[in-house]
């Protein structure tokens, strides 16, 4: 019994590290990661050269959210298409038991890597640009990244093409920007709840902190739930193997 449990544990650990290695070095993820880090370093250097530190809200978007969205888009675009191109998707569907276990492993590895990269960007921002609560920066940015990655994963299973999914996701993200701008122009609508990109550091000066925290909670809970829905529908699309093989 103990031997079986031990073998299962080491098998899962081996699979985990194998997936990390594939994500890092298969395709061009490591190139995107290096470019994202270079982008953050450039932002730090420019701030010191011009003696003009980036405002905290800009740090949230420019140094954390935008590069993370690009990395999340790339990873989720290649999650299914990489297996198709390398003719390994058949093996994933042929795993004894539920194939969802393998896909959930792959999604978990993807989000684990994205989380650690998000931590890296937050630490760079904290130590070299602005003081802020790191856990607030990471958690609020990562919820948005989680939702976008699952949206792109779902669209990849829908279109059977990572590039079509990536383009569609970019269109949707742009539409969400326009939607927020439109709702912000209507005084009777509280656009805070509908701002997909809401920053925790954008609190209006005259708003009570408890009310602001409540708005943030509702906003991020909604975004996280939508991300879970996209993940569910993406996994459901993978139930039918024929379109993917």
Residue positions per predicted region:
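Aromatic- and glycine-rich beta-strand/loop motifs that create alpha-glucan
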Residues: 1-33, 242-244
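Terminal transmembrane helical anchor/hairpin motif
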Residues: 46-53, 171, 175-245
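Helix-loop-helix units of permease transmembrane domains in multi-pass membrane transporters
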Residues: 78-111
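Hydrophobic alpha-helical transmembrane segments that constitute the membrane-spanning cores
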Residues: 99-132
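A structural motif at transmembrane helix-loop-helix junctions in multipass membrane proteins
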Residues: 142-182
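Alpha-helical transmembrane segments and their immediate interhelical/interface regions
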Residues: 64, 125-157
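Long, hydrophobic alpha-helical segments
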Residues: 58-82
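Aromatic-anchored segments of alpha-helical transmembrane domains
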Residues: 38-45, 114-124, 171-181
């Amino acid at each position: 019994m103990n031997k079986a449990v031990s073998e299962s544990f080491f098998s899962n650990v081996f699979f985990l590290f194998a997936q990390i290695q594939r994500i890092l070095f298969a395709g061009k993820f490591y190139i995107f990661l290096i470019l994202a880090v270079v982008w953050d370093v450039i932002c730090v250097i420019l701030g010191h050269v011009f003696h003009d530190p980036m405002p905290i809200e800009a740090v949230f978007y420019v140094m954390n959210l935008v590069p993370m969205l690009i990395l999340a888009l790339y990873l989720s675009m290649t999650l299914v298409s990489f297996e198709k191109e390398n003719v390994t998707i058949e093996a994933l569907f042929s795993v004894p038991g539920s194939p969802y276990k393998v896909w959930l492993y792959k999604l978990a590895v993807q989000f684990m890597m994205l989380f650690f990269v998000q931590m890296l960007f937050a630490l760079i921002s904290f130590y070299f640009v602005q003081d802020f609560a790191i856990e607030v920066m990471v958690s609020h940015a990562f919820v948005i990244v989680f939702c976008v990655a699952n949206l792109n994963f779902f669209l990849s299973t829908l279109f059977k093409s990572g590039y079509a999914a990536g383009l569609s996701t970019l269109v949707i993200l742009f539409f969400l920007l326009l939607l927020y701008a439109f709702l912000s122009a209507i005084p009777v609508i509280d656009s805070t709840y509908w701002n997909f990109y809401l920053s925790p550091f954008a609190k209006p000066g005259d708003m009570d902190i408890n009310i602001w925290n409540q708005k943030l909670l509702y906003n991020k809970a909604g975004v996280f739930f939508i991300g879970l829905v996209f993940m569910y529908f993406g996994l459901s699309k993978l139930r039918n193997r024929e379109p993917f093989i």
